[in-house]
């Protein structure tokens, strides 16, 4: 479950038209969120508020052996008045959904974020963004300031995001703590996104790290034929025949530590279906670290609107070690008790639909006389109950599970109870059945 501040930060990206699809670090983000979702530990309570359209606060209290907490503040130069901030109105998909599909390249500077489901997810219907992008002043010069103080450790973290142009953005993150070298560390990232490709340069004071990474898109909506049709040139019929409803992406990264004189690199590729794809949304990635010999493959699929699954396979060419992991999330429109009894989420919505009249077979007498039956009076039209949309959410919660080759099992149930958003989870070690439970936690969020 995403924290409130991360939800507001994603809303800031959506209001300014910035998409993270072209970032190499998010190449396999879909499978990572489906498999490596965090397990709550202990008890954590969060109280947050979007006090003004430009300012948000969050207070957190934790009890994991010792009592600690944090205080967070966020300021956005872009007004976020249209963002649902009350915990009883925040769409659960924006906080809990893991599968993340790609946006159309033509949506650069448009409305890539949906308050209904969060990131676009392929076949799941999207609602129009509530913020009118044309009414936001200086959205290409927007900025975001974020700070968080952890108590009683007195650890301070801060982040600044500054937009200089529609394609150029700078992000600076810093952490201040006495136990760190020189009392803290800072990471600076320069992002340049042109839609068809994206380039990032980074520098970290921890080890004097210098890095460069990039991602290039081709095929699908990134092809020349499709881009020309979006610009009004080219034949729509020929474009439709040549179009591939998926996008290929290839990229890599290189980094070098100026203090420890060491470096590294990796290469990666991804194929993901586009929102216009009418079939099953899927994402497949392959990353290779030639220096360390690591090969990583992932495959994620949105089998149903309420079911997403992912697998990951890692292999090392030098040591012949391998590791695998699987994960899934299952959305339900039933309460936890009804969900455990077993029922597909769509059954409740379909059970209220009346049966439609079937076509009557020709009578035996008519068949013998080689004629049709006499016409019967037309039956009264059947009224089909419409699916309720106002006052009732499509889903009430989500069940997440993962299993790795080490037989580590993670289970999480996330949902909403009245005005509280909760996450209840546990970690189980199947290799130690005598003491299987490794962690157990409950996280509760409330925002206004």
UniProtKB/Swiss-Prot annotation:
What is the primary gene name for this protein?
A: MDM10
Function of the molecule: Component of the ERMES/MDM complex, which serves as a molecular tether to connect the endoplasmic reticulum and mitochondria. Components of this complex are involved in the control of mitochondrial shape and protein biogenesis and may function in phospholipid exchange. MDM10 is involved in the late assembly steps of the general translocase of the mitochondrial outer membrane (TOM complex). Functions in the TOM40-specific route of the assembly of outer membrane beta-barrel proteins, including the association of TOM40 with the receptor TOM22 and small TOM proteins.
Impact noted for substituting residue 420 to P:
In MDM10-1; produces giant mitochondria and results in the accumulation of specific deleted mitochondrial genomes during the senescence process of the fungus
Domain-level remarks: Lacks alpha-helical transmembrane segments, suggesting that it resides in the membrane via beta-sheet conformations similar to those predicted for other outer membrane proteins and porin.
The alphabetical list of record keywords is: Membrane, Mitochondrion, Mitochondrion outer membrane, Transmembrane, Transmembrane beta strand
What domain of life does the UniProt record list for this protein's source?
Eukaryota
Q: Which family does it belong to?
A: Belongs to the MDM10 family.
The protein's location, in the record's own words, is: Mitochondrion outer membrane
Q: Name one GO biological process term.
A: protein insertion into mitochondrial outer membrane
Q: How does it assemble?
A: Component of the ER-mitochondria encounter structure (ERMES) or MDM complex, composed of MMM1, MDM10, MDM12 and MDM34. Associates with the mitochondrial outer membrane sorting assembly machinery SAM(core) complex.
NAD as a keyword of this entry, yes or no, is no
Extract the HAMAP family matched here: Mdm10
Annotated membrane topology is: Multi-pass membrane protein
Q: Indicate whether Membrane appears among the record's keywords.
A: yes
* GO CC entries: ERMES complex; SAM complex
Q: Which Pfam family, giving just one, matches this sequence?
A: MDM10
Spell out the protein name for this chain: Mitochondrial distribution and morphology protein 10
InterPro entries recorded? Mdm10
């Amino acid at each position: 479950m995403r924290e409130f501040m991360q939800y507001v930060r994603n809303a800031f990206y959506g209001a300014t038209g910035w998409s993270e699809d072209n970032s190499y670090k998010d190449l396999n983000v879909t499978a990572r969120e489906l498999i490596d979702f965090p397990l709550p530990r202990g008890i954590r309570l969060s109280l947050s508020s979007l006090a003004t359209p430009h300012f948000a606060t969050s207070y957190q209290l934790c009890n994991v052996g010792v009592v600690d907490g944090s205080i967070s503040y966020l300021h956005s130069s872009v007004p976020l008045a249209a963002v649902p901030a009350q915990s009883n109105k925040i769409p659960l998909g924006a906080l809990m959904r893991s599968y993340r599909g790609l946006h159309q390249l033509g949506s650069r500077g448009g409305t890539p974020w949906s308050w209904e489901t969060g990131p676009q997810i392929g076949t799941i219907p999207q609602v129009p963004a509530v913020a009118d992008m044309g009414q936001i002043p200086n959205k290409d010069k927007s900025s975001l300031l974020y700070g968080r103080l952890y108590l009683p450790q007195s650890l301070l973290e801060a982040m600044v995001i500054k937009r200089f142009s529609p394609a150029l953005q700078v992000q600076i993150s810093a952490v201040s703590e006495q136990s760190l070298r020189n009392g803290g560390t800072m990471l600076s990232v320069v992002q340049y996104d042109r839609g068809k490709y994206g380039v990032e340069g980074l520098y970290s004071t921890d080890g004097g790290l210098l890095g460069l990474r990039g991602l290039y898109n081709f095929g699908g909506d990134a092809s020349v034929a499709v881009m020309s049709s979006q610009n009004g040139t080219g034949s729509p019929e020929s474009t439709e025949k040549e179009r591939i409803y998926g996008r290929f992406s290839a990229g890599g990264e290189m980094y070098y530590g100026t203090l420890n004189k060491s470096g590294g690199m990796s290469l990666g590729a991804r194929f993901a279906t586009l929102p216009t794809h009418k079939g099953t949304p899927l994402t497949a990635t392959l990353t290779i670290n030639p220096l360390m010999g690591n090969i990583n493959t992932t495959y994620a699929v949105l089998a149903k609107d309420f079911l997403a699954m992912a697998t990951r396979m890692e292999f090392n060419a030098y040591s012949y070690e391998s590791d695998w992991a699987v994960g899934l999330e299952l959305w339900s429109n039933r309460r936890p008790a009804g969900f455990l009894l077993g029922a597909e989420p769509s059954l409740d919505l379909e059970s209220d639909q009346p049966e439609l009249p079937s076509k009557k077979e020709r009578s035996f007498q008519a068949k013998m006389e080689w004629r049709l039956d006499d016409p019967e009076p037309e039956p009264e039209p059947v009224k089909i109950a419409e699916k309720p949309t106002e006052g009732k959410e499509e889903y009430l919660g989500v069940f997440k599970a993962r299993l790795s080759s080490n037989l580590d099992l993670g289970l999480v149930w996330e949902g909403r109870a009245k005005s509280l958003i909760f996450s209840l989870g546990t970690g189980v070690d199947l290799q130690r059945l005598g003491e299987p439970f490794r962690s157990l936690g409950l996280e509760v969020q409330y925002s206004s």
